[in-house]
């Protein structure tokens, strides 16, 4: 869980923290937290939060933020996207990891370990991606929390899965079996260049909202797909076998750990293309 705040590590990685997390969910304190962060009472948090997380306000289109939510949903001057259609672009700012998908694969995301079946709640769909590639993009508080489409094509239905506490995946400590899977939304993207791609947005903590702007309609490369609300988040992209080749220099860098990328940056190529 490198890069997470001390409070996040406390909630996810310690027995008292996991018990506190369970209590927050049981008492609906998360709703009060959301109401506070969306109100003007949260305005004193804006300056310290921006400074602590190195948020570059010079990039934002709006300068006057009335609430913490306003700061988190800030928009910025449109980025320069890679324009070559056969180049896979990153849908967001974040820290990239890449994994081969095997039948027994599990992925560490937001303090939980997910199999593809856990992630999608659809065993038949998950099976289609065995042998393929999973890209994980972890967004930090300083990152831009809007995300875009990776290619032209057609977007299917949004499938929302509420987060739950349950006894399937341990967060850290077997002695205190408190478990958590974050709320998430997955969509099948029928892309023109990279085959059918499953994109999943995963909310953070108990206040991380996911807003997708459309479904069941054509999509355009670089067009905004949606955004996260109030807390750092993660996006995963699932590709079937042979549908992408990571850039060689990126593949080399990933051997040392996560790699920071920007929305619109070229990260992989369609097969048969240079």
Predicted regions span which residues?
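Contiguous, well-folded functional domains in the mature portion of proteins
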Residues: 1-274
């Amino acid at each position: 869980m490198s890069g997470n705040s001390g409070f996040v590590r406390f909630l996810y990685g310690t027995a008292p923290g996991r018990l506190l997390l369970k209590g927050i969910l049981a008492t609906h304190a998360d709703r009060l937290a959301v109401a506070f962060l969306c109100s003007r009472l949260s305005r004193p948090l804006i300056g310290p939060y921006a400074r602590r997380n190195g948020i570059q306000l010079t990039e934002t289109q709006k300068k006057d933020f009335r609430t913490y939510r306003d700061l988190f949903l800030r928009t910025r001057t449109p980025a320069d996207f890679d324009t070559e259609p056969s180049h896979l672009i990153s849908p967001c700012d974040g820290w990239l990891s890449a994994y081969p998908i095997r039948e027994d694969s599990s992925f560490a995301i937001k303090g939980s370990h997910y199999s593809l079946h856990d992630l999608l709640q659809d065993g038949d769909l998950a099976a289609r991606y065995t042998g393929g590639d999973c890209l994980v993009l972890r967004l930090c508080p300083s990152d831009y929390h809007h995300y875009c489409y990776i290619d032209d094509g057609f977007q299917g239905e949004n499938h929302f899965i509420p987060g739950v506490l349950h006894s399937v995946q341990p967060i850290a400590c077997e002695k205190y079996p408190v478990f958590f899977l974050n709320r998430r939304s997955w969509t099948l993207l029928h892309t023109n260049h990279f085959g059918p791609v499953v994109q999943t947005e995963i909310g953070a903590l108990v206040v991380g909202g996911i807003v997708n702007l459309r479904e069941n309609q054509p999509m355009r490369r670089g067009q905004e797909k949606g955004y996260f609300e109030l807390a750092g988040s993660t996006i995963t992209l699932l590709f079937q076998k042979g549908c992408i080749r990571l850039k060689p220099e990126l593949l080399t860098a990933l051997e040392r750990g996560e790699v920071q990328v920007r929305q619109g940056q070229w990260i992989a190529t369609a097969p048969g293309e240079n």
